[in-house]
Design a protein with these regions (language model features):
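Hydrophobic, Leu/Ile/Phe/Ala-enriched alpha-helical segments that form helix-helix packing faces
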Residues: 4-8, 33, 41-45, 112-120, ...
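A short alpha-helix-loop-beta-strand transition element characteristic
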Residues: 51, 124-125, 233-234
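Electropositive phosphate-/nucleotide-binding environments in soluble metabolic enzymes
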Residues: 75-79, 106, 110, 169, ...
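Long, hydrophilic "mature protein body" segments
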Residues: 3, 7, 25, 35-36, ...
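NAD(P)-dependent Rossmann-like dehydrogenase/reductase catalytic/cofactor-binding core
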Residues: 114, 169-254
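Internal alpha-helical scaffold of NAD(P)-dependent oxidoreductase catalytic cores
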Residues: 48, 84-185
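Rossmann-like NAD(P)(H) cofactor-binding subdomain of soluble oxidoreductases
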Residues: 1-94
Length: 254
């Protein structure tokens, strides 16, 4: 968080494993750890402060948050890039989204958005389906770009967008459709173009399929559920790619 918007008076920075202090007793608690550490963070947070947790991770957190009675917790979709510690972040502004792509929802969304704006960064305060749609687009972005990049030797995001655009488009299209059906939303036309534009902003990013449970695993679970019900795999390209990379041992079968 400090790398994104800097520190302000009253901020307390905690390292991994450090307990959440009694003071300050109010205000947002920004959680910028790895997804696999989230359960420990929640368990270690005083119950009366859990509603103040602000989750800033990639991936679909919905089921996890619901399990922890935090379905209404503040969440953030970060479209930012920090090349290295101490450098100013690159904002997620593209030619198609001049107002930026970063978004937040929940109790502390407006506070977070104001903080970013004070640091010269953009942030949208969204709610309901508007946030769900933005969340799906971000999830498709990371899952599709990372998969296509890994399938082509771990190339950069920029190389994926420039040299493998048609392969990327096909994966994005099927993941968007599967996600829309699962979440009951409809993305605005031009999703691929928006995601490709952001890829050009962070062209230097490396690619790899990581944190499977939180990222590509969400789409693979949709595949498994469909096949179990005797339906066609809604994400065949995604499934084939995961199999080729050895992320899943075998393609699912009815």
């Amino acid at each position: 968080m400090a790398e994104v918007a800097g520190l302000v008076p009253g901020d307390v920075v905690l390292k991994r494993g450090e307990p959440i202090p009694a003071e300050p007793a109010t205000g947002p608690i920004y959680v910028s750890t790895r997804n696999d550490d989230l359960q420990a963070i929640i368990d270690g947070c005083p119950p009366d402060r859990r509603e103040d947790l602000v989750f800033m991770q990639n991936g679909m957190l919905g089921a996890f948050l619901e399990k922890n009675n935090l379905a209404d917790a503040t969440q953030v979709l970060l479209y930012l890039a920090v090349a290295k510690f101490g450098e100013k972040p690159t904002d997620g502004i593209t030619e198609l989204n001049p107002d930026g792509l970063t978004a937040a929802t929940g109790k502390w969304a407006s506070t977070f958005a104001t903080r970013l704006r004070n640091g010269g960064l953009k942030c949208r305060d969204l709610a309901g389906d508007a946030y769900t749609e933005a969340m799906l687009e971000k999830h498709v972005w990371i899952c599709a770009f990372m998969l296509v990049g890994a399938l082509n030797g771990g190339i950069t995001v920029g190389e994926v967008e420039k040299e493998h655009s048609e392969q990327l488009r096909a994966v994005v299209t099927e993941l968007c459709a599967a996600g829309e059906a699962a979440l009951g939303v409809k993305l605005a036309p031009g999703a691929f173009e928006r995601l490709a534009a952001y890829g050009r902003v962070v062209a230097h990013f490396p690619t790899a399929v990581k944190e499977f449970e939180w990222r590509n695993g969400w789409f693979y679970a949709i595949t498994e559920a469909a096949v179990k019900d005797g339906k066609a795999d809604p994400c065949p390209l995604h499934t084939a790619g995961l199999k080729e990379l050895g992320v899943v041992k075998e393609a699912v079968a009815a």
